[in-house]
Amino acid sequence: MAAKAFFDIKAGDERLGRIIFELFNDVPDTTRNFRELCTHKNNFGYKGSVFHRIIPGFMCQGGDFTNGDGTGGKSIYGNKFKDENFNHKHEAFSLSMANAGPNTNGSQFFITTVPCSWLDGKHVVFGKVVSGIDVVKKMESLGSTSGKPSKKIIIEDCGEC
C-alpha cells in the first residue's frame, strides 16, 4: 500500500484546509525524503515553511525551509540527491521534485495544477493529490504570473497519514 502524507495550509491568518498526497512506491528514496521532511524525523523539514512560488494555470512550489525564497532547502541525504526515475508523467495535481538540473533534488517540490508534459523526464514525479484539490485551487488563486503569492501561504502542520 502506498504511503500518504498531509499538509495543513494557511493563507495569512486563514486556514485553507488539508492536502493529502499518495506517494508512489517506485521512487522510494524520493518518497522517504518527502515523508521524513513532513515528520521532521531529522529535526528539520516542511512545518512552518512557505509556498514561495505560485503561478496560476501551472503550479504551486514550496519546500525551501531554510531560506523561504526558492534558493535553499536540503534533503535528508545531505544537500542533493539523484533522480530515481521518470516513470510518472506530470498530470494535473501531481507532486514532483523541483530541481536545478539533473540529479539536484533537495527538499523543494511543486504541485501541478494542469498537465505539464514539458516537465516529463526532467523532474521526478513521486506522488499525487488524493484529497484537498480545493485547497490547492485556493492556493493557486493567490498566485500571480510572477509567482509571488498575494498572501503568505504556510504549511502550518504536516506529517504522515
From Swiss-Prot:
It catalyses: [protein]-peptidylproline (omega=180) = [protein]-peptidylproline (omega=0). One of its GO terms (molecular function) is cyclosporin A binding. Binds cyclosporin A (CsA). CsA mediates some of its effects via an inhibitory action on PPIase. SUPFAM superfamilies: Cyclophilin-like. It comes from the Eukaryota. One of its GO terms (biological process) is protein folding. Gene3D superfamilies: Cyclophilin-like. PROSITE patterns: CSA_PPIASE_1, CSA_PPIASE_2. Keywords: Isomerase, Rotamase. GO terms for cellular component: cytoplasm; intracellular membrane-bounded organelle. Found mainly in the tegument, gut epithelium, and muscle layers. Also found in the interior of the parasite. Its EC number is 5.2.1.8. Residues 6-160 form the PPIase cyclophilin-type domain. Belongs to the cyclophilin-type PPIase family. PPIase A subfamily. PPIases accelerate the folding of proteins. It catalyzes the cis-trans isomerization of proline imidic peptide bonds in oligopeptides. This is Peptidyl-prolyl cis-trans isomerase. It comes from Schistosoma mansoni.
